[in-house]
Amino acid sequence: MTLRSLADIRARAADRKGGEAALAALLPTMKTAAELAAIPDDRWLSMMSRCVFQAGFSWKVVETKWPGTEAAFWDFSPARCRAMSDEEFDALLKDSRIIRNGAKVRSVQNNAALVMDLSAEYGSVGKAVGAWPADDFIGLLDLLKKRGDRLGGGAGMMALRFIGRDGWVTSPDMVKALVAEGVMDGNHDSQKSRKAIQAAFSQWSAEHGTPFAHISRILAMSVD
């Protein structure tokens, strides 16, 4: 794939944001594989759940309710959430501490099962995510989509970003930039486009070792 250099794209983004220093200050800090591996499984379930609840809803409301949500879901203990009874599910739908959306409440139980399964397979969710190769980030997204509940698309990508795993987020501005760079058409969910995004990010990252998360933000900030 013939791509414009990341340096050129970064220069455009820097011009739009007031200079290189201003741009650099807007780039996220990502965790190492060892740091990700050290994150307990309950914090992974908490972040997954938070991003599921935020999807299509006011993030400010979710943030305000989150301490109560943590308490209502037993501090997101995977084993406890997985064992949620029908009676407890019904009680949660009446609990004013949380956002009472039945499908999202049920996703906590289902994603607790995912967390426990990954922990059994890899030693912990953090070990699984931290060791996942960068050149197969789409494979990690596929895992969340296929084996998780409501973790396809934005929720899964945002959970990984917020917890510190390097990767991209297909925000509207980043998609616009990828289309402008000729990487893909507007349908970023197709298998063809996802493979093209992976190839482009791997190529750009190879130029100077730039993390995917930085490339993602640089692209998003390079367009009007």
Residue map of PLM features:
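Short helix-capping/linker segments at secondary-structure and domain boundaries
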Residues: 55-61, 115-123, 183-184, 223-224
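Alpha-helix N-cap and coil->helix boundary residues
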Residues: 61-64, 83-84, 120, 169-173, ...
